[in-house]
Amino acid sequence: MTPFLNSLYHSNSTLAFSNVFNQVKAGKTSDAETMIETGLFGLNQGSFMVNYGGTNTQQAAPFILSKNGGYTSAVFHGNTGSFWNRNTAYKQWGYNYFFDASYFTKQDDTN
């Protein structure tokens, strides 16, 4: 995966910026996900994913890639699916599969 991402970054048709300012708001990581997937900014109050993620249709990357390129998409997150309303928002964004904390095996020993 990294060689592919590197090729996108170094392509002459790619715009890349080295001086970027943090735009997340009250939604924290959910705002970052919203911006990456949809291009929309976070809300001043609350989380976009919580307030609008399950009720509105957004033109998100997974949906666009599925519709225009036939891609199947999956998303992985180590927290519960209901946290920041991810279980609903990810479906609205067009993800085919969502693997949350219940999918992963938890280990007490991290060594």
Explain the meaning of each model-derived region:
Residues 2-111:
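Active-site-proximal alpha/beta segments of enzymes that process anionic O-linked groups
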